[in-house]
């Protein structure tokens, strides 16, 4: 999955075990992200993933909220926001803690729905990513429960003129504004 639409302010300095990253490139909403098309869906998934990584690298959930209006994923990442805001730690070791590899050229329509789609792929957590914790031992980001190499799907729905990442907990009357670690 490729995404290359970022706002850059100053020279990017990667995080280390001694200091957090500086001037992390901020994902910008692609012009076609809300189009009801395969290209629009791809742009949405790419932006969603870039925003997810941005929260992990900065604690700033503002870009994620543009891809997650109901704050489902932003809330699930709140521990990172609090960690950065409280100067308790940061992520280091990689610029992209989470990557996704889509394994088909197009998504599949979810059965029984005209607005939901699944795009199969693999989600991987970087083995190099670590979490620095002030006054404590650093931790690996990837754990035995991380979904590495596991076949997953980006499950999305088009509703109210935009794409939403689904969690898998929506049921048939989805609250179309959610996302999932099991879906993506």
Where in the sequence are the language-model features?
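N-terminal low-complexity, Pro/Thr-rich disordered segments
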Residues: 1-30, 174-184
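A mature extracytoplasmic/lumenal domain signature
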Residues: 68-71, 79-81, 96, 104-106, ...
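Exposed beta-sheet edge and beta->alpha loop/turn motif
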Residues: 1-2, 106-184
């Amino acid at each position: 999955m490729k995404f290359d639409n970022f706002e850059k302010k100053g020279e990017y300095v990667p995080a280390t075990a001694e200091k957090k990253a500086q001037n992390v490139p901020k994902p910008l909403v692609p012009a076609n992200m809300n189009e009801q098309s395969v290209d629009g869906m791809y742009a949405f998934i790419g932006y969603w993933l870039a925003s997810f990584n941005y929260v992990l690298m900065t604690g700033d959930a503002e870009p994620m909220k543009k891809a997650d209006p109901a704050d489902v994923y932003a809330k699930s990442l709140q521990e990172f926001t609090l960690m950065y805001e409280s100067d308790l730690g940061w992520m280091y070791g990689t610029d992209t803690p989470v990557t996704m590899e889509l394994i088909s050229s197009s998504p599949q329509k979810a059965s029984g729905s005209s607005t939901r789609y699944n795009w199969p792929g693999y989600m991987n957590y970087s083995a190099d990513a670590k979490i620095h914790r002030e006054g404590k031992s650093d931790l690996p980001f990837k754990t035995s429960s991380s979904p590495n190499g596991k076949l997953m799907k980006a499950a999305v729905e088009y509703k109210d003129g935009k794409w939403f990442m689904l969690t898998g907990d929506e049921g048939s009357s989805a609250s179309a504004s959610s996302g999932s670690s099991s879906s993506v």
